[in-house]
Design a protein with these regions (language model features):
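Short acidic-glycine-tyrosine-enriched beta hairpin
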Residues: 63-78
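Conserved short histidine dyad/triad with adjacent acidic residue
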Residues: 14, 27-44
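Glycine- and acidic-residue-biased ligand/ion/polar-headgroup-sensing regions
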Residues: 46-57
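A short, N-terminal "cap"/entry segment at the start of jelly-roll beta-barrel domains
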Residues: 1-25, 60
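A cytosolic small-molecule/anion-sensing beta-strand core signal
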Residues: 53-54, 69-70, 88
């Protein structure tokens, strides 16, 4: 059994990010964003998967916008430009390789 305290919490206005697992090469984060928060498009540092726990976001990958709702999952590749706009207060888990 592995138990990890929610450590390395990062709070920025409109966004709350907590690392819930890391083994040095892979990590999982829980991210909460407030309605109206915009994260500008940026290249993905690694292949990643995102699972939306609650809320609704507009996620942009390579210029294409998609509405993502609670219980949706999708993945994207290292280097892909991605960003989001929170349409509601939302919470998601993102899992990714730390080093590729």
């Amino acid at each position: 059994m592995f138990i990890n305290k929610l450590s390395q919490e990062v709070k920025i206005s409109g966004i709350d990010k907590k690392q819930i697992y890391s083994n040095g090469t892979f990590e999982s984060l829980v991210v909460a964003v407030e309605k109206g928060m915009v994260v500008p498009a940026q290249p993905a540092p690694a292949d990643a998967g995102l699972y939306l726990i609650s809320g609704k976001i507009e996620f942009e990958i390579a210029g294409k916008k998609t509405c993502v709702e609670a219980d949706d999952f999708f993945s994207f590749s290292k280097g892909e430009l991605h960003g989001l706009t929170a349409l509601e207060n939302s919470k998601f888990i993102i899992s990714r390789n730390v080093f590729e």
